[in-house]
């Protein structure tokens, strides 16, 4: 009874490509309209003033201005809201 599988058969060797998620524009940065602010899965960050949300939950600037973050309490979860200050 073999206890090794033999040459050329392994169950390892798979990995997915990174999705490059995260904050792309930090607080205090100046951005133009259409700039991507955050790439995310789900809504860890919520859109605030002058910020739109895409179908994949990406947050983007609707107007030119400066990025600002604020903490909010929503349904016992601490979330952050992203605003663009003009």
Swiss-Prot record:
Instruction: Please report which protein family the annotation says this sequence is part of.
Output: Belongs to the bacterial ribosomal protein bL27 family.
HAMAP family, per this entry?
Answer: Ribosomal_bL27 (MF_00539)
A Pfam family the protein falls into: Ribosomal_L27
Query: Which GO molecular function terms does the record list?
Result: structural constituent of ribosome
Q: What is the protein's given name?
A: Large ribosomal subunit protein bL27
The biological processes this protein is annotated with in GO are: translation
Keyword annotations for this protein, in alphabetical order, are:
Ribonucleoprotein, Ribosomal protein
Q: Which organism is it from?
A: Prochlorococcus marinus (strain AS9601)
The keyword Transcription regulation belongs to this UniProt entry's keyword annotation? no
Identify the GO cellular component terms for this protein.
cytosolic large ribosomal subunit
Q: Where is this region: Disordered?
A: 1-24
Instruction: Give the highest taxon in the source lineage.
Output: Bacteria
Q: Which SUPFAM superfamilies match?
A: Ribosomal L27 protein-like
Per its UniProt record, what InterPro entries does this chain match? Answer: Ribosomal_bL27, Ribosomal_bL27_CS
